[in-house]
Amino acid sequence: MSTNSDEVVYNRQLASVLAKGGPQGYFGYNESHAAIGGYSTWGPFVIWLYAIPGVLFGTGYNTVFWCNMVFGLLCWCVFTWRMDWKHQLAFALGLFCAWLPLRQIFTATSEPLHFFLLAVILAYSRAMADGKRGSTAAALLACVVETIIRPYGVVMFLFPIVYGWKKNCGRLRLAGTVAAALMSVVFSLWAMNTLAAPYSEQSLDFTVFTKMGQGDVPGAVAYFFQKLFAACVSLWADYLQPTLHGGAEQYIVDAAHGFLRVLLFMATILALCLYDTVKKRAIRGKVCSLICAATIFLAILVLYNPLQLRRYSAFLCLLLLMVAAAEDLLVAVLSVPLLVLLVFPAGFAHTDGLPAYNAGMNQQMIQVTEALQQSQDRLTDEKDPWQHTLSFAYGDVHYGYLYALPAGMGIEFDWNTYLADPENTINARYVMVNHDTEAEKRLLEEGWQVLVSTENEIVYERPL
């Protein structure tokens, strides 16, 4: 039983690539889909990268999980290969106490892939300063891939720029790096609008960039600070206060702890920068990490919402920790306040858990898989992606049952209220709902036929 609804979407897309070469149906939200292809919100590139180690693990429920073990191991090896044992120990201690990055590795989301790319960027950027051959290409390639997957990853180009700067070829290298960054962002934005399904209710807010494109710079600045202020108010009222008082939902606690950890890391790195300045030691890496972390943090609050900190804060913590551990053993002092955060507020360390096996759920999933596979076998020559897509009533049925879909089928993650409304068109051939729900009532009124029925869900098939 998965603990995150995103995990099943990653898994089924990866299974589609490994078994069929790509999704035969559509992945999307509320009956939406990409302009080109059938991939979900994150687009195809993340899934294609996971397919590289994925060929070793097949199309099972835990394929993404095992791929994350590979990316986690590669992250450690790439980042620590040039560090002495003292810095490795400081990094390991900080990593354990930070907890969020470690926890993300033991999931089936895509964060460990970004951890690996981050390790490549930082390790090879530092190698650039030592004149290591091939380091520039490796660092820039990782920056390009990270930016294509997540547009705000463009800030990571700052590391190869700063570490690779040399007086005799600095301008030429800078021009090439900036050009690569710009092309990566443009391609990433094109891919988001073309190769990925639209976001649902948690849409990206590009109002700032829209106003700037219209020449309304004062309006863009005003909107930025207005949105930032609203996000900060929400962060305090909706996340920090409930967590401090106890009894908050787990996703609220996760977001609050993510914010507290990022804040602690940034304050510590800033203090180390001041200390190193007094001691006349280099601070370029730590300054770069602060700039990148602050930029991404603001992007999350202004373009997304504070809730996204429950996931993306792990990347920010790891970014700050990696740079500090590679340059300064004093980062080990972070372990004390980080350990305090593990147990207060809300006993964060004791609420985590790996996905659990549920025998009853597994038996129902077997029935769903067999029924859908038999139905799909009759449609092998059908080219319409909607004929290979199932609409899921989110809120009525546990998303873990979606693992039962045969490899290649697409998933429309629809709200139960969306499916229950007769005004909304259902394009998919199949719909998964629960018993005695408004969504099921609509399907019955429209003459949909039961394909398979179990204790906790029913799959309906479009009437012929």
Predicted regions and their residues:
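Short acidic/glycine- and proline-prone juxtamembrane loop motifs at membrane-interface regions
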Residues: 4, 103-113
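Extracytosolic helix-loop segments that constitute the early lumenal/periplasmic catalytic or substrate-binding loops
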Residues: 9-36, 45
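Hydrophobic/aromatic-rich transmembrane helices and adjacent perimembrane loops
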Residues: 11, 111, 117, 149, ...
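Loop-to-helix entry region of an early transmembrane alpha helix in multi-pass inner-membrane enzymes
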Residues: 40, 44-74, 254-263, 352
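Transmembrane-helix motifs of polytopic, lipid-linked glycan transferases
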Residues: 63-88, 120, 269-276
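Signature aromatic-anchored transmembrane alpha helix within multi-pass, membrane-resident enzymes
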Residues: 89-90, 137-141, 178-183, 321, ...
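Membrane-lumen/periplasm interface segments of specific transmembrane helices
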Residues: 173-265
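Membrane-embedded, lumen/periplasm-facing catalytic core of multi-pass transferases
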Residues: 337-400, 404-406
